[in-house]
Amino acid sequence: MNNWDKIWKKRTAEIDHAGTVFETFKELKRADGFDTQDVDGYYEAFYRQWEVMAERIAAGCNERVESLYEIGCGSGVNLFLFSRVKKVGRLGGLDYSPNLIKIAKGVMPDTDLKCDEALNADIDLKYDVVLADSVFQYFNDVAYGQSVLQRMWDKADKMVVITEVHDQAKKTEHMAYRR
């Protein structure tokens, strides 16, 4: 893939999922690398962003989302919220980091989770919605992203959602900031 695998393979966390949904959400976001700022409203803003995304997905599916699969699910933060807040019955995900998949399985042991590259997503088992939230910028090139998008399309019964597709002209600046 690229050098990001070195970063993600080092991520570990013990998640106390006995707390509130919001507290678990914050811990999962931290495990995914959103731990660089600790200012008032930081995690609340991410939660509101998720709520908006979830409402748009629901509206686009006529309020009937029974299954959702996430490419690049990381620690499972989105899947966790779709399970607990939106009560989506069948969830699945795939991520490149074995440590993040381990965290996700610890919080959601009955979820279909796999450690693999995005391009290897199984398209035989369909889901209503297939989501890729802020992962396309980690792909090596446009051709890889196009191939992943095709697999997402083939896997989805109702909707494909891709968030945060970054401006290629600012890729170097963005990667430097994230490191």
Positions of predicted regions on the chain:
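A short, conserved alpha-helix within the catalytic core of class I
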Residues: 139-151
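Short catalytic micro-motifs in class I SAM-dependent methyltransferases
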Residues: 134-138
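A conserved beta-strand element that flanks and buttresses the S-adenosyl-L-methionine
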Residues: 131
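Class I S-adenosylmethionine-dependent transferase superfamily signal
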Residues: 82, 151-152
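Glycine-rich S-adenosyl-L-methionine
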Residues: 156
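Class I (Rossmann-like) S-adenosyl-L-methionine-dependent methyltransferase catalytic domain
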Residues: 1-123, 160-179
